[in-house]
Regions:
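Periplasmic OmpA-like peptidoglycan-binding domain that tethers envelope proteins to the cell wall
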Residues: 246-316
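N-terminal signal peptide c-region/cleavage motif recognized by signal peptidases
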Residues: 28-30
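Periplasmic peptidoglycan-binding/tethering modules of Gram-negative envelope proteins
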Residues: 64-85, 110-115, 132-240
Length: 316
């Protein structure tokens, strides 16, 4: 079942103020930290009151306050950044458009990069049909959620699924192929390549492997996506995968099932040529399994057709 849509004007999950930054109130700085204690109190007060001018002034002091340990600076910055998000969500709930909040979003990210800000930036790009930028923002939100240091308290699973779904949709619609980000410390692929996000297991990933019309030949974007998938599989080396081809609802059901199966097989053959030795199952679903969209009203009929013409990677 598809998770319920989480519209951009619905308040994001933001932990209670006492839990922002791993409990800045419950674990206040010791008195020996001097001015850092005062700064923490000032930031919390301004965040509660949504006093953005005061919050901005206090946030500017975080990098240079000598009595604050470095790890505590990051927590303070996150509290200040989420103060902006709190105000933005109040404005959205009051009916203001998301586009009018862009400056505040940028100010929030300049203080600390939070998943809430990146998800809203993704929604903003999606509303403008800037699909490449939206994909990047949503993937960054997923990475931040998956990092317990950046996000001590994970959002509800439905929120994670919604962001993952929007990231997948935007990557399918982007004119150019958008690669998944790679963690430069660990070398592992993240974003839409994550197999789990804070306990939510990713079982199906729509791949932007596109084909020429009525053909099993990759488009330029499709070839890039197939190459990236091969690199990922060679590094991760899963013992088996399933590829499911899908089509839109134009044409006969039988023709679509045959074409979708042939396309899944074409991708499987390419992966074997690139050296992947795991077992590959291929299926052709034709038009029988339309993509479950986060919000169908966002898209034109042509875009929905494009979203349905996909190959899915299924993890068992």
């Amino acid at each position: 079942m598809a998770p319920s849509r989480i519209p951009s004007n619905r308040p994001f999950f933001i932990p209670p103020l006492r839990s922002w930054g791993l409990g800045l109130i419950l674990l206040a700085p010791p008195a020996a930290w001097g001015d850092c204690t005062t700064l923490a109190q000032d930031i919390q007060t301004a965040a509660r009151a949504a006093d953005l001018p005061a919050l901005a002034g206090h946030a500017r002091l975080i990098p240079t306050e000598p009595t604050c340990p470095d790890d505590y600076r990051a927590k303070l910055a996150r509290v200040a950044a989420l103060g902006y998000i709190r105000e933005i969500q109040q404005r959205l709930t009051a009916g203001e458009p998301l586009a009018a909040q862009e400056d505040l979003l940028r100010q929030s990210v300049a203080i600390a990069n939070t998943w809430q800000a990146q998800a809203l930036l993704g929604d903003l790009a999606l509303d403008r049909k800037h699909y490449e930028a939206a994909t990047l923002a949503f993937q960054e939100a997923l990475n931040l959620i998956n990092d317990p240091v950046d996000t001590p308290k994970a959002p509800p699973e439905a929120e994670i699924q919604s962001i993952f779904r929007k990231a997948s949709e935007c990557r399918l619609l982007a004119e150019r192929y958008v690669a998944v980000p790679v963690n430069h410390r660990s070398g592992t692929a993240e974003g839409l390549a994550l197999t789990a996000v804070r306990g939510w297991a990713v079982q199906r990933v729509p791949l932007p492997v596109t084909f020429e019309s009525g053909s099993t030949a990759f488009t330029a974007k499709g070839e890039q996506a197939a190459s990236d998938l091969a690199d990922y599989l060679l590094k991760q080396n899963p013992p088996d995968i399933t590829l499911v081809g899908h089509t839109d609802d134009r044409g006969s059901d039988q023709e679509n099932r045959v074409l979708s199966k042939r396309r899944a097989e074409a991708l499987a053959a390419y992966l074997r040529e690139q050296g992947y030795e795991g077992r590959i199952r291929t299926e052709g679903a034709g038009e029988s399994q339309p993509i479950e969209l986060d919000d169908p009203d966002r898209y034109t009929e042509e875009e929905i057709w494009a979203l349905n013409r996909r190959v899915e990677l299924v993890r068992r």
